[in-house]
């Protein structure tokens, strides 16, 4: 992996400002363990250990104690956490656990060893805390779970992993709702604090996705749609960076690159790149683009990503970026790599590749291929390939798009397909395309109405030569009557 990979590990483990500030406050409020002992809420063994542990100031002293008494440490932390209900004390214990792990990643093993003896999993003690009311407690528990899962010798699996990933998705979705202006219950938490807590959740995801097995589990849990939902809404640049970082991590796996084709990732990232004013966001987008082209083992997959980048006019953006100076040499290297690869793809680009890429991007425009008689004569039948993949996208756009230009071009293309492919009418009817085109004959946009009308006529008429003459004479009147 690259240098940036190491930086990312640090990014993901560092707490957000609000959590760092609260943790400092929590550390300063020492707990009176003696009162808990007198109230018989904790054992003398746990009381004695925690007081000795607190007295170890230097990392060396602490490390020495953990090496000889690691099992007791895990046992005491977990006993205190499960037997004390006072929120302030629970916060204090969680902060101690988090500090202990952050100082040395290998210390996760003391929790794994203790859990094994109790026939539990290391994270089973922390997962229930995700349901608590206090946001600091919840997010500290979430960070500890991520560290145990990412740095431990055992993988989180099954219902535990599903539960944790669902919690992450719910938190990220709440950010998505906030971005879209929908009211979200956050109690007395300000939107600034709330967004920092969501950044902490994103940090947990970044840490998890560094492990290949968790990448597959996240994708299976529909996690990519969750990430795309956050990116498609207005979110701060830090969260934007973290979500794209997560995509970059996913794209280290060739199988993931294959799977990610089905999501409209390139258009979304190219839009963000266009507007980006933060170098770290630009850097991570370029690194993700590079992974898509470099890590994909299938030539067809690489070509599809390259075409999508060309279609979204990334070449022009790269040429502009190349003129700028960067502190980070990774950026310059990635720009050079992408320009070279996309330059090669442009040389090989056929009109059908261009059409296919435009259609898959969902951003249809009146590019020359749509009006080219030669293109349709040679390629109409190719829309049937891969079980009508492109036709299904075309009909889907007619169903879901609210962009008049996309609808007009899609209706036009349906008409051209049935005109040039003898059995096209039946295929379009089976895909529900005929009804979708007819629905747009009364659209408020004149271009949509006109192209839908033409497509319906092509679906109905058998004599194309006669229809062509009719359309030539009707076009001006139709346009005037509809406008």
Curated annotation (Swiss-Prot):
Subcellular localization: Cytoplasmic vesicle, Clathrin-coated vesicle membrane
Residue list for modification Phosphoserine: 483
Keyword Membrane: yes
Keywords: Cytoplasmic vesicle, Hydrogen ion transport, Ion transport, Membrane, Phosphoprotein, Transport
Annotated GO MF terms: proton-transporting ATPase activity, rotational mechanism
One Pfam assignment: V-ATPase_H_C
InterPro entries: ARM-like, ARM-type_fold, ATPase_V1-cplx_hsu, ATPase_V1-cplx_hsu_C, ATPase_V1-cplx_hsu_C_sf
Membrane topology reported for the UniProt record: Peripheral membrane protein
Any one annotated GO CC term: vacuolar proton-transporting V-type ATPase, V1 domain
Disulfide links within the chain: none
SUPFAM superfamilies: ARM repeat
Keyword set includes Nucleotidyltransferase: no
PANTHER family for the chain: V-TYPE PROTON ATPASE SUBUNIT H (PTHR10698:SF0)
Family: Belongs to the V-ATPase H subunit family.
Function: Subunit of the V1 complex of vacuolar(H+)-ATPase (V-ATPase), a multisubunit enzyme composed of a peripheral complex (V1) that hydrolyzes ATP and a membrane integral complex (V0) that translocates protons. V-ATPase is responsible for acidifying and maintaining the pH of intracellular compartments and in some cell types, is targeted to the plasma membrane, where it is responsible for acidifying the extracellular environment. Subunit H is essential for V-ATPase activity, but not for the assembly of the complex.
Subunit note: V-ATPase is a heteromultimeric enzyme made up of two complexes: the ATP-hydrolytic V1 complex and the proton translocation V0 complex. The V1 complex consists of three catalytic AB heterodimers that form a heterohexamer, three peripheral stalks each consisting of EG heterodimers, one central rotor including subunits D and F, and the regulatory subunits C and H. The proton translocation complex V0 consists of the proton transport subunit a, a ring of proteolipid subunits c9c'', rotary subunit d, subunits e and f, and the accessory subunits ATP6AP1/Ac45 and ATP6AP2/PRR. Interacts with AP2M1.
Protein name: V-type proton ATPase subunit H
